[in-house]
């Protein structure tokens, strides 16, 4: 088949014609380029951008991390690039000139939406009426949950300025400067939490920013000290001179007819989602460490054969954390000692964690790029094309990229939370956790210590709510505005629900992190107690089994090696609270060693001087006298910081997170003997995560990673 108009055959075969390779008019190439490099490097870039003190905007290069920084009302200040002033003025002048020339333009000389058949020459009055009728939100008392969080409002203000700076919207530069001054003075308009469908933009909430700028009597803002102020006081605090703005034709529409509230909140949500995704990868590796897992699940060949980049990177990050881990070296020795101590393969929550997390990372990363495109887009209507002298009537206000990206992100967050809950459930269950105590109980009396039982119930609650939030918002569209807005994106609603999901994932991450630190401490106790038990048993064995009553060597001395094997095979916390109890396995198994030796002793058992059976009572009596004290001394030494064997965590790449939780945040090892509750400790972690304090220790765990999996060899 011969193709025309410069087109070529698809795959060099006849049948279908496709465009010849050329520039990137459809933007697919740029979208692909944005996904190159590792996700971790992208997160590091975000963190660096978040910490910059100045956010200079000109309409085309705003990043979600910058939005998050300004939204947080920290030190980041906003500056408008002067290069945008001329083009913004040109579009504003074009609107005024076209109206004076009698040109009929939507929202300038016409009514709005389904009533755009109406006409008027009173352009300023039309803009005032637009703001008035869009002020349809409800605030309740102002303190009962009906006000959009200030962080989301600040994000919306920044994004709206950025989109208007491109000069296609017909608004004065001075209005944008005024909004920037409000941001820099930390004066935040009060916007209603609900009332937008993010199609024709976020009309209702954005109208309250316009209301403040124009000095409406019902306009309210929050001052830097948290007090409520009116428009005049807001302008005074922000240092805005010249009084309120009298809107010119198109300016009200330019302010409200955009997607900035949905995309602004989405930006702050995605900044956190990207970091929490990295945290989930690292915590999965720590989970492997404390569970004595098998690190082969991270082997690069497995993931290379699956091809998915998110999975490959997740596995490589976990592989990096586990490479050289002291826990993994110890786990390997345990496996060699007795391969039947645990299943040949770890359960899915560990073994398939890269396969589970990988697609979620890909979704979050794609959503991040989609929202970054959105916050740098011109998304109102009509668009003023000064170069061609026309107003283009379209639908860039349709916030579908926001709704879809947020639905997808929320589903990814729910999946991350589900994995975290599965890992947590294994960790606290002594049927699955390879020797750790039930509920990670850290005290001496398990009958009076139920550890993380309440935390597991809370985690189930968090996970259930998170799975509910994983349901889509965008399939609940209702036709609005006299069936003019008959399809709409629900972008802000989806962003709000995703923000809720992020909060829940933070709760789960905090709880899991505290539990992992508890498990690290329990492994430290376990190793020291086991060493003390071995030493005690060997001392008792030498004292009671080595010789007979005449001082001659006794055959029972050959039991020592088998006694040590039984100690190695037995979980410390299965007997540590009462090591000499015959209801627990340790004493039974030690006795069995002696019994088996006695059964093999033949006729010598009939002689009191050579009988092994005759030694059992003395051996057990001596153990009962010394073993409990040895175990208590070992536990006390760990608690006092004088342990004979140091904690393995200090030799691991995951140590910065442990150090952060234990030393910087001051959390403690939890036991039923103390009054400190799990909630008190995990709340310290939650507050720290909300403040971003976890970011540096998290990235420190990965500072040596070169961005590649280990070679296959």
From Swiss-Prot:
Record cross-link 5-imidazolinone (Ala-Gly), residues: 199-201
UniProt GO cellular component terms: cytoplasm
Pathway in which this enzyme or protein is active: Phenylpropanoid metabolism; trans-cinnamate biosynthesis; trans-cinnamate from L-phenylalanine: step 1/1
Main location (coarse class): cytoplasm
PROSITE patterns per the UniProt record, alphabetical: PAL_HISTIDASE (PS00488)
Record flagged with keyword Cytoplasm: yes
Active site: 106 (proton donor/acceptor)
Single GO MF annotation: phenylalanine ammonia-lyase activity
Residues modified to 2,3-didehydroalanine (Ser): 200
Reaction(s) catalysed (UniProt annotation): L-phenylalanine = (E)-cinnamate + NH4(+)
Pfam families: Lyase_aromatic
Gene3D superfamilies reported for this sequence: Fumarase/aspartase (Central domain), Fumarase/aspartase (N-terminal domain), Phenylalanine ammonia-lyase 1, domain 3
The entry's keywords: Cytoplasm, Lyase, Phenylalanine catabolism, Phenylpropanoid metabolism
NCBIfam families, sorted: phe_am_lyase
Record note on quaternary structure: Homotetramer.
Task performed by this protein: This is a key enzyme of plant metabolism catalyzing the first reaction in the biosynthesis from L-phenylalanine of a wide variety of natural products based on the phenylpropane skeleton.
Name of the featured protein: Phenylalanine ammonia-lyase
Organism this protein belongs to: Oryza sativa subsp. indica (Rice)
